[in-house]
Amino acid sequence: MLTVKDIRQHFKDALAREDFVIDKSGVKTIEMVGASFLANEDAIFGDVNWDYVRREIAWYDSMSKKVADIPGGAPKVWQAVASSKGEINSNYGWAIYSSENHKQYWSVMLELLANPNSRRAVMIYTRPTMHSDYNRDGMSDFMCTNAVQYMIRNNDLHAVVQMRSNDVVFGYKNDRAWQHEVMGRLLDDLNSKGDNRYGMGTLTWQVGSLHVYERHFDLIAQ
C-alpha cells in the first residue's frame, strides 16, 4: 500500500508536470482521485499546528455546532462556511458522540466488544440530507468525512477513514489528528471494558478527491 511519502512524491511530480485541475472558483488545484494510503505520518506537507489541533478536538468533544465555541476563536475558514447563525455541520464529535446522531462511537465499541471480528463497526459521519443541509441559512459545509470503519485483526485495532474530499495541506493534518485521537480512545475503551488486550494497528486514508490548492503550491515545491 502507498504511504504518505508516496503521496507527497505524487503531488511533487504532478506540480512539475503542471498537471492541474481547475476548481469551481477558477483556482488551479492538483488532485488525486481515489487516493488510498497508510496515514503513517502526521503531515503530508508543512507542520502540524498542535495548539490548534488541541483546541479543535476540545470543540469536537463539546459537540457544539457553533464556530464561536471553538476555544481561542474560530479560524477564518470556519467563519466563512458557517450559517447566518454561526453554525456548521462538521463538528465531528457531534457526529460520533451525540444522541442526535445515534451515539455511533458507543455502537462501534459495543459491536467490537461483542464481536471482535466484526465488519459492522462503522461510524457514519455524513448523511443523505447533507445534499440540502450543507447550504441551509447561508452555510457552505458539506461534510468531508463519509465514514470510518474499525476492525480488529491479528489482535490490533485498525481504522479505515473514507472521505469525499481532503486538502493535503491543512485538512489532512487536522483530520488525521482527530482520527488518531478517536482510534486511541476506542482502543483504550476496548482494552478496559473487555477481556482482550489489543494494540494500535494501521490508519488507512481513502479519499475521493485528495487535493492541494494553488496558494499552497510553494509548499510542494520545497
Describe the function of each predicted region:
Residues 1-222:
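Terminal, non-catalytic protein-protein interaction segments that mediate quaternary/complex assembly
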